[in-house]
Amino acid sequence: MLVPPINLHAWVEQHRHLLKPPVGNKCIQQDGFIIMIVGGPNARTDYHYDEGPEWFFQLEGEMVLKVQDDGTARDIPIRAGEIFLLPPKVPHSPQRAAGSIGLVIERERLPHEQDGLQWYCPQCNHKLYEAMFPLENIETDFPPVFDHFYRSLALRTCMQCGHVHPAPERYAAIEA
């Protein structure tokens, strides 16, 4: 059975209250593709690794897509009304401004594919940690990996330069 068209602007207005931290991400359709609306602000320090391409359409406000490009960290600004197709296998970290809203489309993973979350040293860009896993639910599969990384001072300490990757405030008691 065909799903009727979705009025995207009306959907955003009706669900705007859900597009806020800590999650800020709502899947609106999933059938071959994962179609999400994502609101800002966010303060992600991880990089997502996807074996398929990801399509970004910035509806409101702006974002910066931080990417790891041949061992170099660089920023790709995406403003309201702009689209960007991220090629497969490019580690990326979406940084969304307060009040921003974007549409992200990813294809559903093939059975043999793994998603990944990676962290890089903010001082020297050395890879600190990477976890690969089969993605089943983007809203529930990421948090346990975040917890594992942020709760470990050893994982967050750069073996190359000694810098300690900061953890979000809710993990502050771990460092005490």
Swiss-Prot record:
Residues binding Fe cation 2: C121, C124, C158, C161
Biological or metabolic pathway of the protein: Cofactor biosynthesis; NAD(+) biosynthesis; quinolinate from L-kynurenine: step 3/3
Cofactor note: Binds 2 Fe(2+) ions per subunit.
GO-annotated biological processes: anthranilate metabolic process; L-tryptophan catabolic process; NAD biosynthetic process; quinolinate biosynthetic process
Metal-binding listed as a keyword: yes
EC code(s) of this entry: 1.13.11.6
Binding locations of substrate: E54, R96, E106
Cysteine-cysteine disulfides: none
Record's keyword terms, sorted: Dioxygenase, Iron, Metal-binding, Oxidoreductase, Pyridine nucleotide biosynthesis
Catalytic activity line of the entry: 3-hydroxyanthranilate + O2 = (2Z,4Z)-2-amino-3-carboxymuconate 6-semialdehyde
HAMAP family: 3_HAO (MF_00825)
Record family assignment: Belongs to the 3-HAO family.
Protein's recorded name: 3-hydroxyanthranilate 3,4-dioxygenase
Organism, as annotated: Xanthomonas campestris pv. campestris (strain B100)
